[in-house]
Amino acid sequence: MRSSIAFLSLALLLVAADAQAAVGSRVLVQDDGSLKINGRVVHLFGIYMPKDGRICDNSIRPIRCASRAASALRFRIRSVVYCENVSKNRDGSLNAVCLISSRGQIFEPKTDLAAYLLNEGLAVALPNAPFEYKTIERIARSQGRGFWGFFADSIN
């Protein structure tokens, strides 16, 4: 019983500390779809979003890929963003799994931002991505969401 109470107390302290750190963080979605949190650039782990200016082209309906993904992120992020660092890039930016809650409540189920973009068809799962990401991408592709809503000759 005591160990359960101690564990629960520790868990609540960790969640509160995490929430406090996240609440103080200002999140800015950059044009390339990366996040800027406390001055650091954070890329969503496991996905590729075509860089700004690149065209998803089917020769009939060209569309700027990155602007759609960045707009979707800006629309979706309305509360606290919780990021867990996975790796660091040579340029000092981070690759992280980032989650949000729709109403900003600590105990509410979180939405994975990378999974959200994959589900909307606005990103591609990388080879090192979790199996779930690859599955979400395949489903979005089969249902014609986002980039997959037309037969793309290329994503340049």
Language model regions located:
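Positively charged n-region of N-terminal signal peptides that target proteins for export
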Residues: 1-4
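Bacterial N-terminal signal peptides
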Residues: 6-15
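Small beta-barrel nucleic-acid-binding modules, primarily SNase/OB-fold domains
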Residues: 18-156
